[in-house]
Amino acid sequence: INGKIGLPMSVTSIGAYAFAKTACTDFSLPDRVTEIGEGAFESCYEFQNLRLPRDLKKIGNRAFNDCLLSGGLDIAYNVTEIGDSAFYGCTGLDKLSLTSSLQRIGAYAFSGCKYLNCELAIPSSVTEIGDGAFQNCIYLNGNLILPANLKKIGSKTFENCKFFTGTLVIPNSVTEIGQDAFSDCSRFTGLSLPNNLRKIEFGAFARCINLTGRLSIPETVKEIGSYAFYNCTGFTGDFVLPSALESIGTDAFANTQNKNRLVFQSLPKGMQNGYHDCKMRRYVNLSDASYVSDDAYAYLDGASYVRTMTNTWGSLVLPYDMLLPSDAPYSVFTIEKMTNDEVVLKRCTFILNPGVAYIVRRDGEEKTLTFSPDRSVEIRMKMQPTDVGNLKFSGTYQAKEVTDGYILAQDRFWNVAKLKAAAPETQAVMVGPFRSWLEGTTANTSPSL
């Protein structure tokens, strides 16, 4: 089949591979056609001019894959779905207009349409954009506006779209940014990440060399993949990693050239490998997320300290002495012995003294623990009318940098020297309020505040 083909007005669908690999140059598609099937016009190398039918609702997978289409492409008003690889490799297209009824753009739908030379307006109705949907659409330009209801940005979705500009704002509905999703998008100048983001995968923003300003990673992020921000050389200021971070991949911040600090607020898996070759000073700031719901209150004629612990183990400092109840749902320990290799605890059975750092273990399922004296005590603290951090007292416990000894965090004793050895350029560990550390490495060393 070759030349120009006209179809009867009664035709309402084009079947799978109906005209694949034919030499037709032009098709007249009736307006009553509602669906174009899988591969219907695949590899029609002579097919150049395309006008989509008025009533079209669905464009199947690979429908126009590898066609030599030219000029602009207007997606018909009623289309709700563009299938996987539907226009893959249509290198002759130079303009693209998407309809407001569109809901899904399939994987690699426009991948390799490298001469599209226009702004990309993705309708707000779109909830799914597949992997590689606009990969290697090199000349797409202007600001990229992503739809507000988008849930996930897949792997390689906008990889190598080199001419997008301005600030990339990822909507708050997005929880995951896929592998190489924006890698080599080298003309973006700003980045705003969503408040509900959980995961940034391998190479997601690699080589986005013109991103500038301070990188703000949301507190909800639990995983940052290898090379996620590789060669992002324009960022300034500290990189403060979220306290919820559980895993960081190899070289996640490699070659960033940033001369400020890379600040860890947790001890994620892979932290010793997460920043090879970057120029920043490494810094650990352990803020104990287990204690965010602490509530301390006191009176001249009595006192009580209520603590919510999500971890089994924690550190404990009281501003008053307290007789340990025999039926307490927790156990309290002092340090019996401490060496480079071990910490030996000794259980307390009678009185806890004020201002001493103890180790507390939650013994049951109850997470809210109450530490109250059996008599009236005087609390020598200045009470504030509003919370200071999550405490109702200020000036009682100080955050401090430590360079040796042990830290109690995430139900483990962490040897500071070994922690620094795993990341040789780490300067210090920051110990926050309600966090004790154990100085030195000799036996019978007392905990410190």
Predicted regions: what they are:
Residues 17, 39, 108, 132, ...:
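Tight coil/turn sites that cap or link beta-strands
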Residues 337-346:
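Short linear interaction motifs
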Residues 230-296, 300:
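Leucine-rich solenoid repeat scaffolds
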Residues 1-13, 23-35, 45-58, 68-81, ...:
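Structural signature of tandem-repeat unit edges
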Residues 268-328, 346-449:
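A short, polar beta-strand/turn micro-motif
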